């Protein structure tokens, strides 16, 4: 399987985000708005960056691929793929954005498992902050998850840090996965798509068009949902 682009240490990524102009300007605005010292405002920004950033571990992904292979055969009658050739035909060097429907918590595990076994880099996955729980949050980060809050409203510093982290992932060529519906369907039916992450993807590309962007829609169909 492909490891993908340079997987710098999480601390390195955070440091790169904090050095960018957009974040430095947001830090200055935070200092003025909350009457903070530069050190304290930077501490807030750094906290946001660590809250967001993935902590991808390739050995962990290799281990989990074996665990998940056994899990699929236990829960389901195997895994069937359709139209995977559309991904295989994507040109080398393109930025791949997986945009799946979201019917089960198994979705992101299944997509990572499939692309890994097909020889592609495991995507970085946008996950809701509600999943950043003790143990589970660390588990997901090591599999490539990065976390976002449900609302960015009223927090310009958090917005700047998240947008720059997301843009940096794109510029570095990491494939990214986000659920276009915004959340998990509780009924199993497809929901109306939301445009927040899509708009952020377009803005990031327009600011730094280093490579073509290819959107890959993904549909999951299950014999039964483990959530009931």
Predicted feature locations:
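Membrane-interfacial terminal anchoring regions of lipid-handling membrane enzymes
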Residues: 1-228
């Amino acid at each position: 399987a492909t490891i993908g682009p340079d997987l710098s240490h999480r601390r390195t990524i955070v440091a790169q985000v904090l050095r960018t102009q957009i974040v430095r300007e947001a830090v200055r605005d935070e200092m003025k708005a909350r009457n903070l010292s530069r050190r304290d405002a930077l501490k807030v920004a750094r906290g946001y960056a660590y809250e967001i950033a993935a902590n991808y571990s390739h050995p962990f992904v290799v281990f989990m691929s074996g665990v998940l292979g056994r899990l699929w055969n236990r829960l389901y009658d195997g895994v069937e793929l359709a139209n995977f050739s559309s991904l295989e035909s994507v040109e080398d060097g393109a930025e791949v954005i997986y945009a799946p429907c979201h019917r089960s918590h198994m979705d992101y595990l299944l997509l990572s498992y499939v692309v890994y076994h097909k020889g592609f880099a495991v995507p970085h996955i946008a996950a809701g902050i509600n999943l950043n729980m003790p143990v589970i949050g660390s588990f997901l980060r090591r599999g490539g998850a990065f976390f976002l809050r449900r609302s960015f409203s009223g927090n310009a510093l958090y917005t700047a840090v998240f947008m720059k982290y997301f843009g940096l992932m794109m510029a570095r060529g990491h494939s990214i996965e986000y659920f276009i519906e915004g959340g998990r369907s509780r009924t199993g039916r497809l929901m109306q798509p939301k445009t927040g992450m899509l708009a952020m993807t377009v803005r990031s590309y327009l600011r730094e068009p280093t490579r073509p962007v290819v959107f890959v829609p993904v549909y999951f169909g299950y014999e039964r949902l483990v959530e009931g």
